[in-house]
Amino acid sequence: EMQRSLVGSEMCIRDRATFVQSLAQVGYETICIGGVNFFSKRNDIGRVFPGYFNKSYWLPTFGCTDKNSAANQVDFAVDKLEKYPADRKVFMYINFSAIHYPNCHYVEGKKKDDKESHAAALRYVDSQLPRLFEAFRRRSDTLVIALSDHGTCYGEDGYEYHCISHEKVYTVPYKHFILRK
């Protein structure tokens, strides 16, 4: 039963704590495919976000140190997606780890992460997305929301990486679009 926030309003408030749990409540299969260790379920912090989903997965081959992590994650996602009938609503969250450090292995001979290796990691992840998008297209029209969880410093103001308070870390790319069947 949806509760209306205002009479005549199209806005509703669910009685679940998170957006993901609310989608599950209205019939979505919710799937999380983790990349970084925050999704590993190996400790308390690694169980929090995956716990919001009906199904959550993490494998070492999805992690930051596996050069083929995005391909592994997309292969896994497509396999899982194809197990559901086309009329089953699916919300899938994928945490692509390839962009996180270390990403220097995406540039031959590079020993340290920098903007060049970060860009190469982004190109690598982007190269894997068409297979995932095609799997969703075969099902139905799909809303895609693509965003980062944080930015990264590569020497700006003397800072490296993202575990700091800096404008570059707070700058997060975002894009949404509809994939048509």
Segments (PLM) and residue ranges:
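Single conserved hydrophobic/aromatic residue that forms the stacking wall/gate
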Residues: E1-I13
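Generic structural signal for small/hydrophobic residues in well-ordered secondary structure
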Residues: L23, C32, I94, L129, ...
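A long, amphipathic alpha-helix that forms part
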Residues: V74-P85, V107-S148, Y154-G155, K175-K181
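Short beta-strand segments
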Residues: C32-G34, V90-A98, A119, I145-S148
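Loop/turn elements at helix/coil->beta-strand transitions in domains of secreted/extracellular proteins
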Residues: V26-E29, A86-K89, S140-D141
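Short, solvent-exposed loop/turn segments at secondary-structure junctions
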Residues: V36-S40, F96-Y101, H150-C153, Y159-E160, ...
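Formylglycine-dependent
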Residues: V36-R88, A98
